[in-house]
Amino acid sequence: MTVNLLNFNQAALAEYFQGIGEKPFRAKQMMRWMHHFGVSDFGEMTDIAKALREKLAKEAVVAPPSVHLEQISEDGTRKWLIDVGAGNGVETVFIPEDDRGTLCVSSQVGCALDCTFCSTGRQGFNRNLSVSEIIGQLWVANKALGRDPKGDRIISNVVMMGMGEPLANFDNVVAAMNIMLDDSAYGLSRRRVTLSTSGMVPAMDRLREECPVALAVSLHAPNDALRDEIVPINRKYPIAQLMAACQRYLEKAPRDFVTFEYVMLDGVNDTAEHARQLLNIVQDVPCKFNLIPFNPFPNSGYDTSKPDNIRRFRDILMQAGYVVTTRKTRGEDIDAACGQLAGKVQDKTKRSLRRIKVEAVA
């Protein structure tokens, strides 16, 4: 059976080479060719012995996922629909800024968590992505963007904030992030790789031990009653448990704060009282806030908070001494903004079908 070498981080690749009678150092060579240089043809890997190249050509491949569609926004944001087979596709977004280039990477085909304000969740869930399908998004984007003439990185930051809950696909996501961090591959620092979770507490503890990168938490509500409703995983891991997990995570994190993401939903979670409740629940967690104006999608049932309400909410947090950013909406014209990623999901949960039936009855 043909082996896709993009599924291996360097440790797994060393095991693979030992298994075929080769020295483990071949793993470092292969990592550089695959990821640093973006080469998928063994014949072009000139410092690898010809006999080994011929052997690899018979039993292995370097096979990134294919791009079904590429779109470029008026603001320079780029979105790729990545074909992952069986009628499924995931979306990857590159956001260029003056001081950085951020790639937003998906971890699952759809999402099983069913947050009520998220377009991805509305699509249901099909499966976890493999390591090659996760790191392949970075591979594909690097190829498409080319090299900066000045030698600077075009992709300087990676955020695991695309489709899916990364910690629900723990092993594959961590293996892919290890490739991102590997100096023989992409060489990103732990501070420049951010994982966003809705709050899978046991997996947060495991991540702290196995691959502590920068942490963002999709909080979105300042009390359990509201969070139970809009972020259903809160029923399993309520806010007190989540805050305690954040404190534990910071013991080994590369940054000394957690970023709390908070989508601004008109009349739902955006009042001054909500802001004061938010200050109360985070008081023991060093943090900053990222306020996200809701990006509408069809039949969402929500509206974006009014600008004055967002400013009032922000000011209450800032007056308490916190760093607060309000996320700029990028790529909205190509549905690449936060919460808009939907891809193509062959839903195995039948969630989307159930919702259609409910809406039809209503």
Swiss-Prot record:
Note on file? Reaction proceeds by a ping-pong mechanism involving intermediate methylation of a conserved cysteine residue.
**Family assignment from sequence similarity:** Belongs to the radical SAM superfamily. RlmN family.
Disulfide bridge map: 104-338
What the entry lists under Pfam families is as follows: Radical_SAM, RlmN_N
Q: Which InterPro entries match?
A: Aldolase_TIM, Methyltransferase_A, RlmN_N, RNA_MTrfase_RlmN, rRNA_lsu_MTrfase_RlmN/Cfr, rSAM
Q: Which free-text remark accompanies the cofactor?
A: Binds 1 [4Fe-4S] cluster. The cluster is coordinated with 3 cysteines and an exchangeable S-adenosyl-L-methionine.
| Protein keywords | 4Fe-4S, Cytoplasm, Disulfide bond, Iron, Iron-sulfur, Metal-binding, Methyltransferase, rRNA processing, S-adenosyl-L-methionine, Transferase, tRNA processing
Where does the Radical SAM core domain lie? 97-333
Q: What biological function has been recorded for the protein in this entry?
A: Specifically methylates position 2 of adenine 2503 in 23S rRNA and position 2 of adenine 37 in tRNAs. m2A2503 modification seems to play a crucial role in the proofreading step occurring at the peptidyl transferase center and thus would serve to optimize ribosomal fidelity.
Q: Which organism is it from?
A: Methylobacillus flagellatus (strain ATCC 51484 / DSM 6875 / VKM B-1610 / KT)
Q: Which HAMAP family match?
A: RNA_methyltr_RlmN
Q: What is this protein called?
A: Dual-specificity RNA methyltransferase RlmN
Q: Which GO terms describe its biological process?
A: rRNA base methylation; tRNA methylation
**One Gene Ontology term of the molecular function aspect:** rRNA (adenine(2503)-C2-)-methyltransferase activity
Reaction catalysed by this chain? adenosine(2503) in 23S rRNA + 2 reduced [2Fe-2S]-[ferredoxin] + 2 S-adenosyl-L-methionine = 2-methyladenosine(2503) in 23S rRNA + 5'-deoxyadenosine + L-methionine + 2 oxidized [2Fe-2S]-[ferredoxin] + S-adenosyl-L-homocysteine; adenosine(37) in tRNA + 2 reduced [2Fe-2S]-[ferredoxin] + 2 S-adenosyl-L-methionine = 2-methyladenosine(37) in tRNA + 5'-deoxyadenosine + L-methionine + 2 oxidized [2Fe-2S]-[ferredoxin] + S-adenosyl-L-homocysteine
Name the NCBIfam families for this protein.
rRNA_mod_RlmN (TIGR00048)
GO cellular component terms listed in the entry, alphabetical order: cytoplasm
Q: Which cofactor does it need?
A: [4Fe-4S] cluster
State its Enzyme Commission number(s): 2.1.1.192
Q: Where does [4Fe-4S] cluster bind?
A: 111, 115, 118
Quote the subcellular location field of this record: Cytoplasm
Enumerate the active-site residues: 91, 338
**What Gene3D superfamilies does this protein's entry cite?**
1.10.150.530, Aldolase class I
Annotated S-adenosyl-L-methionine binding sites: 164-165, 196, 218-220, 295
